[in-house]
Amino acid sequence: MFLINGHKQESLAASDRATQFGDGCFTTARIIDGKVSLLSAHTQRLQEACQRLMIACDFWLQLEQEMKYLAARQQNGVLKVMISRGCGGRGYSTLNSGPATRILSVAAYPAHYDRLRNEGATLALSPIRLGRNPHLAGIKHLNRLEQVLIRSHLEQTNADEALVLDSEGWVTECCAANLFWRKGDVVYTPRLDQAGVNGIMRQFCIRLLAQSSYQVVEVQAVLEEAMQADEMIVCNALMPVIPVRACGDISFSSTTLYEYLAPLCEHPN
């Protein structure tokens, strides 16, 4: 089911700036027992992205009601929410554009995540590197061509996910997940002020770790540093947390961090 500006429909205007330029943002949430997991965090993410992209929106209460409406009818699955700047404007100009368009859809939960939680995921180093742009770093904007290319290369391997570097060689994230690795009692995750997406589950894990016996550090790290870890995990709002059993030729056997985070992230509300 799709809702576009509150109406059940599946077509979007060809002149909408989402289709013209990828001019907008989105978030993907897990539906558990008819409720949107971490609803307020997803709404805040969209608000922050719209502010960064200078998209004027005044429909946040209405949007949350629509999110709850679709979740109640899906029960368990995935909710995707997109916001575009709407129609209008000449060329790249945003003058006389809007109002903003909101697009909601639901889908089944990805079944392979259950298998990966039990077996652990394998990562392959992606040949595609992320561009660095502090104006867009952190937000989940609609321009995802880098991820499309990363996924296309990943599908030519036997790995489950891609480990992605930025254009300067810093470990950044995965194709559709964030990354953590543990060395002793210190947990590291890449800084995302120049590239990458600051995922909802990444934020949640950082808050959990800050209240634990672990020390959590956001770092700039090269691949060799990350590969010296005792343990590695990936996370996103749907997984929510999955242990990594191998990255290329490097294997990880410890699941200490995963066993701590997994039950806390499964029902985060």
Enumerate the language-model features and the residues they cover.
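Helix-start/capping segments and mature chain N-termini
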Residues: 1-68, 73, 84, 89, ...
